[in-house]
From Swiss-Prot:
It catalyses: alpha-D-glucose 6-phosphate = beta-D-fructose 6-phosphate. Catalyzes the reversible isomerization of glucose-6-phosphate to fructose-6-phosphate. The gene is pgi. The lineage of its organism: Bacteria, Pseudomonadati, Pseudomonadota, Gammaproteobacteria, Enterobacterales. The keyword Cytoplasm applies. This is Glucose-6-phosphate isomerase. It comes from the Bacteria. Its main location: cytoplasm. InterPro entries: G6P_Isomerase (IPR001672), G6P_Isomerase_C (IPR023096), Phosphoglucose_isomerase_CS (IPR018189), SIS_dom_sf (IPR046348), SIS_PGI_1 (IPR035476), SIS_PGI_2 (IPR035482). GO terms for cellular component: cytosol. Keywords: Cytoplasm, Gluconeogenesis, Glycolysis, Isomerase. SUPFAM superfamilies: SIS domain (SSF53697).
Amino acid sequence: MKNINPSQTAAWQALQQHFEQMKDVQISDLFAQDKERFSKFSATFNDQMLVDYSKNRISAETLEKLQALAKETDLQSAIKSMFAGEKINRTEDRAVLHVALRNRSNTPIIVDGKDVMPEVNAVLAKMKQFCDRVIGGDWKGYTGKAITDVVNIGIGGSDLGPYMATEALRPYKNHLNMHFVSNVDGTHIAETLQPLNPETTLFLVASKTFTTQETMTNAHSARDWFLSTAGDQKHVAKHFAALSTNGKAVGGFGIDTANMFEFWDWVGGRYSLWSAIGLSIALSLGFDNFEQLLSGAHAMDQHFAQTPAEKNLPVLLALIGIWYNNFFGAETEAILPYDQYMHRFAAYFQQGNMESNGKYVDRNGNPVDYQTGPIIWGEPGTNGQHAFYQLIHQGTKLVPCDFIAPAISHNPLSDHHAKLLSNFFAQTEALAFGKSLEVVEAEFAAQGKTPEEVKHVAPFKVFEGNRPTNSILLREITPFSLGSLIALYEHKIFTQGAILNIFTFDQWGVELGKQLANRILPELAGDEAVSSHDSSTNALINRFKEWR
């Protein structure tokens, strides 16, 4: 990967000049000027996913200039470097190969002179065997009963991805009940365990190092809960499995290392649901469906690696995002899935994007002079319409939005899905085209009201429009199509990081708080006042000690 400051490129200067021409252009005018706009600014992937980016404040010239930026920052070589297993995560000296985990074509991928695919396939085979035994009831607990409940204990990438995917694909779930515990707040594990039976519960402890504070605190509490009924330490082996690389610590915990599922340092946490970290997904859906999830992602990987930038969906979405973030000053992006099963999708990519591209230092080690990652947020529709859409429609912040919906519902109750999708279509139309004062006044006139009667209220009913959106319409949310959708967003994030000259695959920003927490923890043990911090932190700790 080349370390090129994007703001110093000729393409960036051209985009700044172009922005002056585009900043007041109306989306409605762009549609009026070109009856073929939709067909020119949309694409269908694999007959499964329609991506419509026509309702954006872009022209063909905008895209040409954005593509020139991708070319001048040598995006293509960055993509090749990732797929080739080069150590593009330079601050940790690691390759970045979540694409290897779902490499269904099994072509060799070399890291340090060694093909990683045999090991990837071996872990997948081990996962399949384990899943078949647990789902089929052959795996028995310490009293000889089959497993009914699975508790995944992890945090961050070891929790968000598996939880998102098992929820999104809930229509495919089998008889196993899945539970996810992440927060070190004791309430999370206590409430999760309260209705469960230790005789039929299986715990998955997901921690690469087996030292993550939150995960190991919860794992020890889960083990204590289990042993309070089971009694004998040897029974732990039948009720706990590990997703880890630390065999010594796993064995010391009481887990049989035969039930330890490994992954590698070239798998980043927030890109790890495709690895052994996805064991909870495979247990919930069955291994065949987990393989379909991998296959859907692999299909998008091939599209990303092989399609010219002009028609490459992750690249196009990434460039449009850079356009808003750096030239329009949009600080946030909303992800709005019109599907209740997808209720954790925005949270998942909140981590995926903000932990990846929330960086202020470039790949040369210098502070950047441009915007990097946006703030990501969102909720399912139509709930969001009754919460925060007011600001998106009529507020002073520009919030580009991704609207996501399936054409086919897993729950075709009455006319529910038609009503849901009518809102999905209506919102992007309303955001793009708005409603003028003339239309508002005409509507009032049609109701028989005089201009004097409506003068005081008409301005408040005006919608300026010109709010940009992407629409992603899936045929149906299946393991395959969800895999493709997740990979689309992953590669969008990679593309933005590559162009913006930052390291997307480290996360040093989480370290300082952890270090300070480790220092503060022993200070909370006694009752004596603390004075080793600033006045605010001292006062907060001391008030906590008074009140606890």
